[in-house]
Amino acid sequence: MKYVKLMLSQVVVSLGIALVLNASLGVFPISATNLALCGWLNVSYGVANLLSELMMLLYAMYRGERIGVATISSCLLGGFIVDFFTSILPTTWLLAPIGIVCLPLGYGLVGSCGLGENASCMFTTALQKQFNKSTKFVRNVMEICFLIVGLLGATSSITWFSVVLSLGFGTVMGTIYKIIGYNPTEIKHSWLIFRK
């Protein structure tokens, strides 16, 4: 049952990203980074997402986080599920609020499965432990950094909406985590690699 919940949760994460992309108001800062990678490397969003997830994963592993089934499924499937949803969803700004809620809800649901976290959440957790800061603080700093990388890639999808997301997504994420009772630094996961 945990694996079914994991896959459905990964769909919620990818749906959240796709909803914001198709809202055409701007993109999540991490999506700005992925879009910059698309331009620099001439690859699809799915491939760019895989590359950025791998970079975050390597840092998180360096800091002592471990890989679970959720980590693997996120890296291998997440961006491609986004590709699918963006191809079938309508383009309207009304999708943005739903996407802003779906993404952190999906992140929390993935983590609560106890099968590991996706790479960006592992990265967040590693930074939380390293600097002893809250999800809200760490994620807001991460989002600002992702936005800067996106700006360096001259991503035309970055708008006022992306800036607002970079300043407030960590707050939304922290709030949703509290609502669903998920604390990433306290949950015990089943790991595939680097067991202690």
Language-model features: locations:
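Core subunits and conserved enzymes of cellular information-processing
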Residues: 1-196
